[in-house]
Amino acid sequence: KIIYDTYESDVAEKGNTARRIGDEYRKAADKIFDSDAFPYESDICFGDIEFVPASYAENHGIPEYAIITNELELDKSYDLKEFGSKAGHLTVYVQSETVTAEKLAEVLLAIKDLFDKNGVTFYVIDCVLEYPKPEDGAQRDDFRMEVKDFLYSDIYEEEMVKRVTDNDEATKAYWQAEDE
């Protein structure tokens, strides 16, 4: 007796193909984050390709740029750079004694540069800049800077601090609304 069959999600909706691409992208991002060239203290850092089955594409919280899994082809060889530039999503938490918009702008510019040098593309980044955790492991919650869905195309020197500040404020408003 079959209780649960995953053929529909894994094969027909191309879930296995999306998982394979996502795993390769995550490995490429991890290689950068785990390297000596990554200059930041971070306990959370990873990369994903945003995929969604067509039946969930309109749900709350699904990014507009997510790739519809049903449109993938089984067993096709895909270009990670192309997928990264369309739907690559980095998540990075950085600990620093300096938590300012200027420092977060510096971090974003450095991460973009490092990923560019390693040929790994991304579309957006979520990045949290926070104080180091104390010895007891408790997180200070008095101040942090955070950008959510910060576009790769918005990471450049000119007026970077303003874009970071604007996104931080929008992100705080987003989380406030989600908590209500």
PLM-predicted stretches and their roles:
Residues 1-2:
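N-terminal "mature head" segments of proteins
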